[in-house]
């Protein structure tokens, strides 16, 4: 039988392989937004949040995607993505911190790995900019399109409502611990809801 340390090492290796494979596909299919100042800003806020998590088994990395639609998502092993579209909807650093906190917690709690163990039917990688059909929920992940994908044979599925709610609550708490205003979360959620509703309306015309 494997001991705890061996199991943890296997889990970390799985996270890293899924994250690296997903990063390559995202870079190829979507592309990164080449704005050094914007990238530094997002990374600065992200690392400020990560510093409040304590010691971590991997390095968190933050990327700005060249995508006009509002979106944010995370891959295992600390790969966090935000689109230039969602950055355009954030009015303050506090709002960005709440969005990043949400995605960081998906990684920290290994939600992708947990979800992939539920025998979800795999699908071809979908560009995360595709807006989800329902915006009735109140979590970030229920408003913007979390990616349902398969990377190198490993399933990455959409998160459950329980995982989304947990990421919202813990992500906001993480933002508060880093000195950010928790009231930014409902503000940015409302703005995202309105924007996605507008996009869906345009797509139906």
Task: Show which residues each predicted segment covers.
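Short, conserved phosphate-binding/catalytic loop or strand-edge motifs used
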Residues: 142-151, 191-193
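Peri-catalytic and regulatory segments of divalent metal-dependent proteins
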Residues: 2-136, 153-156, 168-205
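Intrinsically disordered, low-complexity segments enriched in small/polar residues
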Residues: 134-139, 144
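Short-chain dehydrogenase/reductase
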Residues: 157, 161
């Amino acid at each position: 039988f494997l001991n705890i340390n061996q199991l943890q090492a296997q889990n970390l290796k799985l996270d890293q392989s899924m994250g690296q494979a997903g990063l390559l596909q995202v870079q190829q299919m979507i592309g990164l937004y080449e704005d050094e100042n914007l990238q530094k800003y997002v990374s600065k806020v992200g690392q400020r949040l990560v510093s409040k998590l304590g010691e971590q088994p991997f390095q968190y990395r933050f990327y700005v995607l060249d995508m006009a639609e509002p979106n944010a998502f995370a891959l295992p092993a600390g790969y966090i993505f935000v689109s230039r579209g969602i950055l355009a909807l954030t009015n303050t650093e506090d709002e960005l911190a709440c969005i990043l906190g949400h995605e960081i917690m998906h990684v920290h709690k290994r939600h992708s790995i947990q979800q992939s163990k539920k025998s979800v039917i795999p699908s071809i990688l979908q560009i995360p900019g595709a807006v989800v059909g329902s915006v009735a929920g109140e979590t970030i992940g229920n408003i913007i399109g979390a990616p349902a994908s398969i990377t190198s044979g490993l399933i990455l599925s959409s998160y459950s409502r329980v995982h989304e709610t947990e990421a919202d609550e813990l992500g906001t708490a993480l933002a508060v611990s880093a000195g950010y205003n928790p009231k930014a979360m409902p503000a940015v959620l409302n703005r995202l809801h309105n924007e996605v509703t507008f996009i869906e309306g345009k797509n139906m015309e």
